[in-house]
C-alpha cells in the first residue's frame, strides 16, 4: 500500500500547487513585476512545504503565501542602455527596494458539509474524510469570491451552497479585520 499512499500524496501535492497558483495569480497585479516593459520582469515562486497536515491544507497554504508575498521586497534595478544592449544592475542598498501590492490577495476558507443541512469551517483531516461535501472558497478583501471548488463526491443543495458561501465571506471578513 505504500506505493498507493505515495501516489495519493503526490496527487494531493500537485492539486494543492495548481490551486494555489490559480488563486494567487488571478488576484495579483503582475504589472508590478515589470522591470522593462516587454523585456524584463521579476519571476516570483512561492514554495510551500507541508511538514504535517491535519486537514485544511489549502487555507493554511494560501495564508502562508499571502504573508510571504506581503513581506517580499524587490530590490531596486537600474537599466543601463548602450548602443547594442541593455544591462540590469541590482541595487546594493536595502532601502532601495519596493514592496509588492498584495492588498487584493484572497484568503481561502474551507467548509465541510456533513449532512443535508449541517456544515462547518476549518475541518480536520478526519472531518474531511467523513464529509459529505467539501467546498473551498477564496475571498478577497472586498468580499468578492475569486475562486470556488468542490473537492468531494457529494452534492450540495443550492440553498445550502449560498449559505456556505455567505459563511465563507463572513469568515474571511473577520480574518481580514484581524490583519489590519
Task: Give short role names for the model-derived ranges.
Residues 1-180:
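Polyanion-binding surfaces on beta-sheet-dominated domains and ring/shell assemblies
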Amino acid at each position: 500500500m505504500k506505493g498507493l499512499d505515495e501516489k495519493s500524496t503526490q496527487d494531493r501535492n500537485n492539486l494543492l500547487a495548481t490551486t494555489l497558483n490559480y488563486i494567487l495569480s488571478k488576484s495579483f497585479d503582475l504589472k508590478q513585476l515589470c522591470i522593462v516593459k516587454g523585456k524584463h520582469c521579476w519571476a516570483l515562486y512561492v514554495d510551500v512545504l507541508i511538514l504535517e497536515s491535519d486537514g485544511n491544507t489549502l487555507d493554511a497554504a494560501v495564508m502562508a503565501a499571502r504573508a510571504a508575498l506581503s513581506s517580499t521586497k524587490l530590490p531596486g534595478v537600474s537599466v543601463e542602455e548602450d548602443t547594442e544592449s541593455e544591462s540590469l544592475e541590482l541595487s546594493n542598498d536595502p532601502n532601495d527596494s519596493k514592496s509588492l501590492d498584495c492588498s487584493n490577495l484572497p484568503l481561502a476558507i474551507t467548509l465541510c458539509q456533513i449532512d443535508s443541512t449541517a456544515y462547518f469551517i476549518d475541518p480536520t483531516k478526519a472531518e474531511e474524510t467523513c464529509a459529505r461535501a467539501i467546498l473551498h472558497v477564496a475571498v478577497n478583501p472586498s468580499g468578492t469570491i475569486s475562486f470556488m471548488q468542490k473537492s468531494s463526491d457529494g452534492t450540495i443543495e443550492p440553498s445550502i451552497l449560498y449559505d456556505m458561501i455567505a459563511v465563507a465571506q463572513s469568515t474571511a471578513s473577520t480574518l481580514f479585520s484581524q490583519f489590519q
